C-alpha cells in the first residue's frame, strides 16, 4: 500500500503525539520523594522551596525565570551563603517539583504565588529580591505593589521591555498547544544544545534543564507564561520604583540573544537611579556561564 506524503506527515504527527502522551511523567508524591528542601501548600497547590544559609542572616529571595526552576541558582547560592545571607529559593508552578495547576500563567498568578510563599513561611522581617529573566519581571511588579518589606532589588536579564509579538505557538491557542505538547521536547533540546555551544552552559546544567521536559504540565506552563507574562510592559512599575527610591541593580549580558540589547538603555530612561552592569561576552545563560562576575556584582550592591 502506498501512502501519500500528507498521510505520512499525519502518521508521524500521530506517533509523536502518542509518544508524548506516554512518556511524560506526572509530578506526584513518588517524584517529590527525591526533592531536596520542603513543600508548602498555597491556594493553587504545592510549592517546592528550600532555605539555605544561616538562620539569622539577612534574607534574599531568588525568583527564577521561564524554563529553568530553582536549580538555576546553583552557582549563586554558595556565594550568598558564604557572605552570610539566608537564601530562599522555590520552583514556580509548572516547574521543578511544584504543582501544575491548569491556570493562566500571568503576573497575577506569580505575584500571588510569591506573596503566599512569604506569608506561609512567616517571613516578617525585610528582605532582598533577586529575579532572573521572567523572574525579573515578577519581582519588579511585586515590589511596585509591596514596597514595605523589600530592601533592595536585583534584576538579571529582566523582561519588561520586549517589543513585538510572541511566536505563532503562543498566538494560536489550539494549534500552538498541540505543537508545544508534541514538539516542545525537541524545541527545548535544540535550545539547550545551542546555549551549550554558543554560550558555554555546562553539561550538568543542560541535563537538569532537559530533565524538566519529561514531566507533565511543564510545556503548558511555559507556553502560558509566554502568552501572558513574558511580553508584559514593566515601564509603569519601574516608574513607581523610582518614585519610591527603591535601590535597583540590573545586570545584562552583552551577547544576550533573548533580552534585546537596548533593554538596559530603556530601563535607564524610565529609572535613571537604577545601577546598570553589563557583562562582556555573556549571553542569556549568564547566571551559569559568568557566575563569578554576577556574584561579585550582587554582593557589592547588597553591601553598599
Predicted regions and their residues:
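Alpha/beta-hydrolase fold catalytic core
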Residues: 1-58, 82-85, 235, 303-304
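Conserved alpha/beta-hydrolase catalytic His-Asp/Glu region
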Residues: 28, 166, 181-244
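Active-site loop/oxyanion-hole signature of alpha/beta-hydrolase fold enzymes
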Residues: 43, 50, 82, 89-130, ...
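Conserved HGGG/HGGXW glycine-rich cap/lid loop of the alpha/beta-hydrolase fold
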Residues: 52-97
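Flexible "cap/lid" loop of the alpha/beta hydrolase fold
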Residues: 144, 151-181
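Short beta-strand/loop motif that positions the catalytic acidic residue
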Residues: 244, 250-252, 256
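Acidic catalytic loop of the alpha/beta-hydrolase fold
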Residues: 255-259, 284-285
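Catalytic histidine-centered segment of alpha/beta-hydrolase-like enzymes
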Residues: 282-291, 295
Amino acid at each position: 500500500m502506498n501512502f501519500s506524503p500528507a498521510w505520512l506527515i499525519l502518521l508521524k504527527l500521530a506517533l509523536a503525539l502518542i509518544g508524548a502522551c506516554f512518556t511524560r511523567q506526572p509530578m506526584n508524591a513518588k517524584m517529590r520523594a527525591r526533592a531536596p528542601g520542603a513543600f508548602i501548600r498555597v491556594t493553587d497547590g504545592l510549592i517546592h522551596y528550600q532555605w539555605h544559609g544561616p538562620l539569622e542572616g539577612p534574607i534574599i529571595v531568588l525568583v527564577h525565570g521561564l524554563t529553568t526552576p530553582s536549580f538555576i541558582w546553583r552557582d549563586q547560592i554558595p556565594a550568598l551563603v558564604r557572605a552570610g545571607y539566608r537564601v530562599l529559593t522555590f520552583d514556580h508552578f509548572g516547574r521543578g517539583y511544584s504543582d501544575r495547576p491548569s491556570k493562566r500563567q500571568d503576573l497575577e498568578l506569580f505575584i500571588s504565588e510569591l506573596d503566599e510563599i512569604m506569608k506561609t513561611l512567616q517571613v516578617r522581617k525585610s528582605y532582598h529580591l533577586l529575579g532572573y529573566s521572567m523572574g525579573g519581571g515578577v519581582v519588579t511588579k511585586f515590589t511596585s505593589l509591596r514596597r514595605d518589606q523589600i530592601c533592595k532589588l536585583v534584576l538579571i536579564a529582566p523582561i519588561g521591555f520586549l517589543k513585538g509579538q510572541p511566536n505563532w505557538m503562543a498566538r494560536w491557542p489550539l494549534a500552538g498547544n498541540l505543537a508545544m505538547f508534541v514538539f516542545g521536547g525537541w524545541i527545548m533540546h535544540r535550545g539547550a544544545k545551542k546555549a551549550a555551544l554558543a554560550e558555554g552552559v555546562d553539561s550538568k546544567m543542560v541535563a537538569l534543564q532537559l530533565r524538566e521536559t519529561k514531566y507533565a504540565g511543564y510545556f503548558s506552563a511555559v507556553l502560558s507564561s509566554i502568552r501572558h507574562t513574558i511580553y508584559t510592559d514593566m515601564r509603569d512599575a519601574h516608574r513607581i520604583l523610582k518614585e519610591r527610591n527603591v535601590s535597583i541593580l540590573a545586570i545584562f549580558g552583552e551577547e544576550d540573544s533573548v533580552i534585546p540589547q537596548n533593554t538596559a538603555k530603556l530601563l535607564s530612561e524610565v529609572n535613571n537611579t537604577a545601577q546598570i552592569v553589563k557583562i562582556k561576552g555573556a549571553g542569556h545563560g549568564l547566571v551559569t556561564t559568568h557566575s563569578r562576575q554576577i556574584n561579585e556584582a550582587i554582593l557589592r550592591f547588597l553591601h553598599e
